[in-house]
């Protein structure tokens, strides 16, 4: 999944080229082979007046010799025994031993040259599994939520642990701020300050509501005396309040995270970093990532004389940008055209607020049952469709469903769930989609944000704000202020790239998402938990309600949170959350139809 936004009305080639390591070309196929030096990568300054994003490679936790590892892996394919990385390093990095005959010295030199060339040959020929053995663990800091959403988490091949806006108060001491001319910079900074003011004010307004909610669920805790008990309740309530208040925070809010990728993914980052949405920031961060790896292994981008033919894409070369035929045409898109698209999309959702099931195989239950019977060599006479589905989905018959690990990916019987596909049409907030991206088996085709920008605020209203008139007034005023600032920047000719940083977390994103029963199964279980953020919980409810309607047998088994699944399988403890227990024994007398009404916070 590639998420993009287009550049500004004016010619943006200069600032983008400043961050592109090869001359831009009319097409990626025509791009000349360019040898990139570490000096080039390090030469590009930060595009921000705020503290620059930082990138640290954890060397002890990462692969130290990605080049040699790829060569050893390739040699292993044709060797009589596994090749050793240390043997590759001796051949490539160390001088020839003393006393070699001229013939042996020449043979060694030839083998060394072939090894150096093999890395580039593997890349060019598409034998890319050899590049996936190398793993790099990065610590990223001061990276915007926009860059993380639009690039670093917009694909399935990563792992991240990111600071939570739900559970960590946002101080606002550092907010990502581009180097804009005046008066645009003042408009931008004022909008940031207004969003932070709204965030703090909403946290304050919502706190009494959540105090009452918390006391309703945990009356003993609310009545407990002492400093420790009071702090426990205050901390829990504050987290709930700031979880909702964060919807007014802009995408300029920075984050720190652990981000782990393999060598192949990092090379893809390097080629595609100029994609729209946040190309300047992403290019800066990716350059730092590659710089860190090159300091560890100078051959990561190819050996001397045999560089990888990366053909890095310029800002206008991305497939999505070309599909729009002309960036200027898209950027001249009228407000009426944007409104027509959004209204049509929203109308198609019909009765559903967040998610509509638009495609599934009507024969899905029978097909999955046939797959189950095929795995174990049974006939329909020996095992009915309902029994076959229960063998996989019923916790009483499948002990894997009570295991702490999600074992379906490695279970032959549970892999039969792959044969039941779904596609949903979704309209959710950016805050929810940032959570949604973590479910990397349910892939979406995310929007070009610039093509979806509307003049009037296009946001969701969180449930806790909708129920409190004072909070709703503050929310609306904050959203209006930052939305007007976004419009003002665009009216002044500021690149949409920078205006996007002012979008609030509550901005709507519209897209299609697909997966299989296997990939949705764990997502639905986790997101139907009362500890899940409210909005993604409500989306999961809509997903499951529609699946239950089209697949009644499957639906009866995928309709509950972890505690329900574990109670059906006999696993203990029934709630796996420990001190994070929601306080409501959902599994008792469970009925999907009553799940939403039983949730308090």
Describe every region a protein language model picked out:
Residues 2-601:
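A conserved ligand/cofactor-binding region detector
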């Amino acid at each position: 999944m590639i998420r993009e936004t287009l550049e500004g009305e004016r010619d943006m080639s200069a600032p983008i080229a400043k961050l592109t390591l090869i001359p831009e070309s009319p097409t990626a196929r025509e791009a000349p082979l360019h040898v990139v030096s570490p000096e080039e990568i390090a030469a590009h300054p930060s595009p921000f007046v705020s503290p620059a994003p930082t990138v640290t490679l954890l060397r002890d936790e990462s692969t130290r010799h990605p080049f040699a590892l790829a060569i050893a892996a390739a040699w292993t394919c044709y060797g009589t025994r596994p090749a050793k990385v240390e043997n590759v390093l001796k051949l490539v990095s160390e001088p020839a031993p003393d006393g070699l005959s001229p013939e042996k010295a020449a043979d060694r030199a030839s083998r060394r040259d072939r090894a150096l060339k093999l890395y580039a040959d593997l890349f060019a020929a598409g034998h890319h599994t050899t590049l996936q053995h190398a793993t790099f663990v990065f610590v990223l800091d001061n990276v915007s939520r926009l860059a993380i959403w639009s690039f670093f988490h917009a694909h399935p091949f990563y792992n991240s642990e990111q600071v939570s806006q739900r559970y960590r108060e946002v101080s606002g001491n550092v907010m990502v701020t581009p180097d804009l001319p005046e008066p645009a910079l003042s408009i931008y900074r004022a909008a940031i300050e207004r969003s932070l003011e709204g965030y703090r004010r909403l946290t304050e307004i919502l706190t009494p509501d959540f105090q009452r909610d918390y006391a309703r669920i945990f009356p003993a805790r609310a009545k407990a005396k002492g400093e420790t008990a009071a702090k426990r309740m205050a901390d829990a309530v504050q987290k709930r309040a700031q979880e909702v208040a964060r919807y007014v925070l802009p995408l300029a809010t920075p984050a720190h995270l652990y981000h782990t990728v393999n060598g192949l993914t990092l090379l893809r980052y390097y080629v595609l970093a100029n994609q729209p949405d946040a190309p300047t920031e992403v290019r800066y961060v990716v350059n730092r990532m590659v710089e860190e790896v090159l300091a560890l292994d100078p051959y990561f981008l190819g050996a001397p004389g045999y560089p990888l033919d990366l053909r890095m894409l310029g800002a206008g070369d991305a497939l999505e940008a070309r599909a729009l035929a002309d960036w200027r045409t898209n950027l001249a898109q009228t407000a009426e055209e944007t409104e027509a698209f959004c209204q049509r999309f929203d109308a198609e959702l019909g009765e559903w607020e967040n998610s509509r099931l638009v495609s599934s195989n009507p024969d899905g239950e029978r097909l999955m049952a046939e797959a189950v019977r095929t795995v174990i060599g049974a006939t329909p006479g020996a095992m009915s469709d309902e029994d076959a589905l229960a063998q996989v989905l019923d916790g009483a018959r499948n002990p894997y469903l009570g295991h702490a690990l999600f074992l379906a990916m490695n279970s032959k019987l549970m892999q039969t769930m792959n044969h039941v596909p779904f596609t949903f049409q979704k309209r959710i907030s950016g805050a929810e989609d940032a959570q949604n991206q973590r479910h990397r088996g349910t892939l979406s085709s995310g929007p070009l944000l610039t093509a979806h920008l509307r003049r009037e605020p296009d946001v969701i209203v969180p449930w806790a704000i909708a129920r409190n008139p004072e909070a709703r007034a503050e929310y609306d005023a904050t959203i209006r202020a930052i939305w007007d600032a976004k419009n003002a920047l665009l009216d002044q000719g500021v690149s949409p790239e920078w205006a996007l940083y002012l979008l609030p977390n509550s901005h709507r994103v519209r897209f299609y998402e697909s997966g299989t029963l296997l990939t949705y199964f764990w997502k639905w279980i986790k997101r139907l938990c009362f500890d899940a953020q409210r909005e993604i919980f409500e989306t999961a409810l809509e997903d499951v309600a529609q699946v239950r309607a089209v697949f009644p047998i499957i639906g009866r088994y995928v309709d509950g949170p972890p505690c329900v699944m574990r109670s059906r399988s006999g696993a203990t403890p029934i709630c796996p959350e420990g001190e994070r227990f929601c306080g409501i024994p959902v599994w008792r007398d469970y009925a999907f139809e009553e799940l939403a009404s039983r949730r308090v916070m």
